[in-house]
């Protein structure tokens, strides 16, 4: 129990600890996450829990799916893409560029679809991106998403602008970076 002399917090420790436990349980059931070190669990979950930047879905009081996101500025986005482990502290909420950091739905495609719907409802007017790494792989690719209320053409224009800025930043910081897939910016 916390001492009564401690200043009150806007966070509810009981709810935060419960969320962390539910998320840890999902990590243990995820083929991709289960062998990751505990420090990655802390690094990737504590900030979004404290900031409320996550969705946790439950079915019959059992956690079935989880995602978290960061809202980055262009510089933080560049650092994150170059070194995903660089995400820390204020980087989780320093801009308006939505990046999905974790996506765990280990039990069914229905849970995955429900999580996608919940995220689209939570961010109806946003485009988002994520770094997607296949299990056992070491190369990430950028996946793109758009909210339900966002016009497809407006979303494409915004994503193309973000993509061009990211490619320019990567080239400037990494010399001969050459993107694969979508061509050059």
Curated annotation (Swiss-Prot):
InterPro entries linked to this entry: RTX_toxin-activating_protC_bac (IPR003996)
Residues the record marks as active site: 33, 102
GO molecular function, one term: peptidyl-lysine N6-palmitoyltransferase activity
Gene Ontology process terms (BP): killing of cells of another organism; toxin metabolic process
EC number: 2.3.1.-
Reaction(s) catalysed (UniProt annotation): hexadecanoyl-[ACP] + L-lysyl-[protein] = N(6)-hexadecanoyl-L-lysyl-[protein] + holo-[ACP] + H(+); (9Z)-hexadecenoyl-[ACP] + L-lysyl-[protein] = N(6)-[(9Z)-hexadecenoyl]-L-lysyl-[protein] + holo-[ACP] + H(+)
Keyword tags: Acyltransferase, Cytolysis, Cytoplasm, Transferase, Virulence
Subcellular location: Cytoplasm
Signal peptide segment: none
Keyword Disulfide bond tagged: no
Effect of residue 141 to L/K: Does not affect ability to activate CyaA
First-level EC class: transferase
GO cellular component assignments: cytoplasm
Described purpose of this protein according to its UniProt entry: Protein-lysine palmitoyltransferase that catalyzes palmitoylation of the protoxin (CyaA) at two internal lysine residues, thereby converting it to the active toxin. Has strong preference for palmitoyl-CoA (hexadecanoyl-CoA) substrate, compared to other acyl-CoA substrates such as myristoyl-CoA (tetradecanoyl-CoA).
Subunit field text: Homodimer.
Membership in a protein family: Belongs to the RTX toxin acyltransferase family.
Name the UniProt record assigns to this protein: Protein-lysine palmitoyltransferase CyaC
Species this chain originates from: Bordetella pertussis (strain Tohama I / ATCC BAA-589 / NCTC 13251)
């Amino acid at each position: 129990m916390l001492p009564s002399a401690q200043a009150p917090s806007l966070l509810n420790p009981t709810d935060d600890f419960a969320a962390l436990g539910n998320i840890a349980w999902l990590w243990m059931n995820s083929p991709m996450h289960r062998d990751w070190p505990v420090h990655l669990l802390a690094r990737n979950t504590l900030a979004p829990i404290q900031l409320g930047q996550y969705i946790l879905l439950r079915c019959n009081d059992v956690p079935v799916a989880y995602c978290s996101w960061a809202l980055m500025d262009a510089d933080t986005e560049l650092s994150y893409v170059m070194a995903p482990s660089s995400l820390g502290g204020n980087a989780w909420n320093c801009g308006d560029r939505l990046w999905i950091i974790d996506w765990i739905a280990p039990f069914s495609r229905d849970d995955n679809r429900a999580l996608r719907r919940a995220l689209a409802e939570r961010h109806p007017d946003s485009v988002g991106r994520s770094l997607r790494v296949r299990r056992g792989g070491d190369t990430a690719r950028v996946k793109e998403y758009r909210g339900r209320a966002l016009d497809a053409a407006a979303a494409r224009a915004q994503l193309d602008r973000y993509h061009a800025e990211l490619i320019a930043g990567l080239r400037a910081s990494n010399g001969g970076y050459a993107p694969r897939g979508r061509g050059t910016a």
